[in-house]
Structure formats: C-alpha cells, structure tokens
Amino acid sequence: MDKKELNTKKRGGDYHLTSKGGLMAFYKNQLTKFYKIGLGNKTEFGVTVDEPLINDYLNKRNTISKEGEQRWYRTDNKGDWVPSVTTVLGVVSKGIYFDKWLANHLDYDHACAARDKAAARGTLVHEIAEQLMEGKEVNVENYGNEIVKRVMCFDTWWHDVKPEEIIASEVMLSHPEIRFAGRFDFIVKIEGKNVLVDIKTGMHYKTHDIQASMYKILWDKICDDLGLGEEYKIHSLAGLYLKDGWIKGPNPQYKALKWCPDVVDSAVTMWRYI
C-alpha cells in the first residue's frame, strides 16, 4: 500500500482515517460520527423554493431521450427536442490538461472506462451531497476513500461557508425559446447573493464557466417569464471542487466561474453546425 493511501478503521466508537504513518483523526468534533454526516434539517437550511410560481414551473415533467453519449430534452412531451448542456459542450475542447490525461490512456476503450468510472463517482458524490442538503444523515462507512474524502470536503465547505438558504437543488431546466436544457446542482444564498454552485469531483476546466453560464441563462429566463425580480435571479457562479488527495484535512476548492454568455452562443452555434 502506498504510504499516502488511507484506510478506514473503527476505534473507540468513532471512525478515523488511518495510514502507515499512524492514526490520523480529522474533525472529531465536527462530525457526529466520522462516517455519519449531517448538515442540519430542512427548516434550518430552507431546502425549498419559496416562490410558488417557480415551484409550479419546476414541477413540470420533462421527457428525456439518450442516444449514445448524447442526452436530449423536451418539456411536457411537446415541442422540439433540444440537446443537454453537456451534449453541447461536447464540441468544446477542455484544454491541454484534459488532452494530457487522455494521452495517458493507452487506447479509446481505456479512456472510456476511466471516464465512466469518474462519472459514476461524481454521480454518487452528488447524490450524497443532495441528501445532506435535504437534512438527512448519511452513513458512508461502506464507501471507499475516494468517495468519503470528497464528501468530507463538501461537509467542510458547507460548515465554513454556512449558506443562509438553499433556493433550489438538482433542478431540470428547459425553456421553449432556448436551444439547450440541463440540470444544475444547487443555488444557495451566500452573504445575501444567489450563487449557482456546480460540484466537480475532477479537475477544473474552462468549459465549467460555459456550463454554469448556460444554467444561469435558463434560470434567469424562467424568472423573467414569471415576472420575478432580482431576488430570485442568479448573481454569481462558482465551482466546488472536491478532491481526495488531501492528507492533513479536507481541502475543498471553491472557485468563482466566469459569466460568459457570448461563449455560450458560440458553443451552441458550433454544435448546431457540426
């Protein structure tokens, strides 16, 4: 085992991280039990969309179709099919660091397997984070370190930032006048401002700016249609990067993402051309 590889052991009724270097206990007072993490209850953190008009809109059923790696949406089984945000972003290069990662895999099948593993990991971390925001206590004892340590990063960020309110989470957005659709992670109120936060369990890519901007375009358009003011619109964008490489304690990376509507237009145009 690598010296930096962490295993889990139960000791004295509490769960800790251990390694060859000896016992390492992190945040004993912060977590009720190391592998049982809870952020609070629904009332305390406001896990609702208070505005009835938004609730009615968001409760509409969306039809989803998937062809290969592409995902398509339409609202209420009506109208044209539109691509998902991530499908559109498939035409945009993630940059040199992604290209280097791809080059490290021997062939296409290995690259796809690594991608699928990362996607499954990300989906699980997202699901756990959503349960925590709903006020549930989540037991992650049986998950591997790559999941547990990312969840601990989320827990640490939440308690450090202390969002005043959860405006919406895991919402599927579509609009008949916009030629893409998608599901964002959550919008929270931080220091009086509505922040769309996108959870990432991998590296930072410039495409994350475009992705968050696409969600903002959809959300703000819905607010305009419903006659809602700035109180409900998104004021800023952020990426929350949850990694498992830390040793001395959870180290979530919270980064501002750039609002880039012009780049969104270019990406959509390129996707439609291709």
Enumerate the predicted regions with their spans:
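Metal-dependent nuclease catalytic cores that hydrolyze phosphodiester bonds in DNA/RNA
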Residues: M1-A181
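Nucleic-acid nuclease catalytic cores
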Residues: G144-K149, V171-I274
